[in-house]
Amino acid sequence: MSVRKLKPITPGQRFRVVNGYDAITTDKPEKSLLAPIKKSGGRNSQGKMTMRYKGGGHKKRYRVIDFKRDKQGIPATVASIEYDPNRTAFIALLNYQDGEKRYIIAQNGLQVDQNVVSSNEAATPEIGNAMPLANIPLGTVISCIELRPGQGAVMARSAGAFAQLLAREGKYATIKLPSGEIRRVLALCMATIGAVSNSDHQLMIGGKAGRSRWLGIRPRTRPVAMNPVDHPMGGGEGRASGGHPRSRKGLPAKGFKTRSRTKASNKYIVERRKTRKKK
């Protein structure tokens, strides 16, 4: 994978860094795995705005992704690596031996014509293979992890993300998540071998406001520029600092822990994620 820094022939391209898309093998998606997406503009079923700064954006079609990897024991061949406008990671089209086609999240290093398999039994821990945590060797880099058996992958799915299997004890496996959190999950949960593709996504620079509009992101108003009725940090004479950083609902921002101390799943967290150091 690579990135491209554009020549500064316009102000919008001066600082722009785009993906080289070297890993992409086709620009035509599988039509049978496409579904329509209706834009909401941040409004609910009553037409009321429930999420600010959303609206517009390029028209897209959803790619139906197989997060469960429940087609057990049937080998599949990687037909193509494709771009997905709905996520940061690339996706891979699999052709199963029984004729079915499915999309999965592509792992880093997954190649066209490579064979992958999903199995509840012990399988070869190669990139792209999916199996329960109980059958994965300790220390393996994994991604697309289930939180509950049969739920489908919910953790480590974005571009470049990966977790690591640290230990197994009884019916639980201990994994280190991308956030740094160390957590126990049931060993029956499925995971995929390898890190998620498109690890260079973090190097992308939009270069201009228009790219955010292409993505459906509208301009964000600074809280200190609002009135007191609209935000706790609004108001004041002239250019006020806004006081202590607060959210729109008045909760402290920048480092305040919002997770409930009595949440039932706290017992599965061995070590909480590290807070980022202020620069």
From Swiss-Prot:
GO terms for biological process: cytoplasmic translation. Part of the 50S ribosomal subunit. Forms a bridge to the 30S subunit in the 70S ribosome. This is Large ribosomal subunit protein uL2. Signal peptide: none annotated. Residues 223-279 are annotated as: Disordered. One of its GO terms (cellular component) is large ribosomal subunit. Gene3D superfamilies: 2.30.30.30, Nucleic acid-binding proteins, Ribosomal protein L2, domain 3. Residues 245-264 have a biased composition (Basic residues). Disulfide bonds: none annotated. The lineage of its organism: Bacteria, Pseudomonadati, Bacteroidota, Flavobacteriia, Flavobacteriales. One of its GO terms (molecular function) is transferase activity. It comes from the Bacteria. PANTHER family: LARGE RIBOSOMAL SUBUNIT PROTEIN UL2M, RIBOSOMAL PROTEIN L2. The keyword Transmembrane does not apply. It comes from Christiangramia forsetii (strain DSM 17595 / CGMCC 1.15422 / KT0803) (Gramella forsetii).
